Amino acid sequence: MQEIKNIREFDEIIAHDKVLVYFYVPWNNSSLSVGEILEEEKDNLSEYEMVKVNLDRILSLTRIYHITTVPDIKIFERGKITKDILGIKTKNELFKELNK
C-alpha cells in the first residue's frame, strides 16, 4: 500500500475514482492491526486504489478531515468522501462497512 508523503500528493490521489485512505499512527496497536488486515485483503479490495497516511507526518489532515480516532478509513471518489469507517477491528467488520 502506497504511503502518502505530503498534502499535495494526498490531494492528487483522492481526486481519483474509488480511493480507500487508511489514516493511522504507528504507535497505536489498533492502527497497525487494521493496516495488516488491509494488506492481507488487498486482492479482495482491488476495486479501490489503497493508500495510507501516517498522521504523525501529516498532522494537518486531522483538522481538515476531522479525524479524532485512529484507525480511520475514508473512501473518496473524485475528491469527495463517500464513506467514513471508524472502529474496525476485524476483516468481517471492514467488509460489512464497505458493503453498506
Q: Whereabouts are the PLM-identified features?
A:
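Absolute protein N-terminus
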Residues: 1-2, 100
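Thiol-based oxidoreductase modules, predominantly thioredoxin-like and allied folds used
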Residues: 3-5, 23, 39-42, 46-60
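Acidic phosphotransfer microenvironment of two-component signaling modules
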Residues: 8-11, 59, 92
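CheY-like receiver
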Residues: 12-13, 61, 97
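Structural micro-motif
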Residues: 65-74
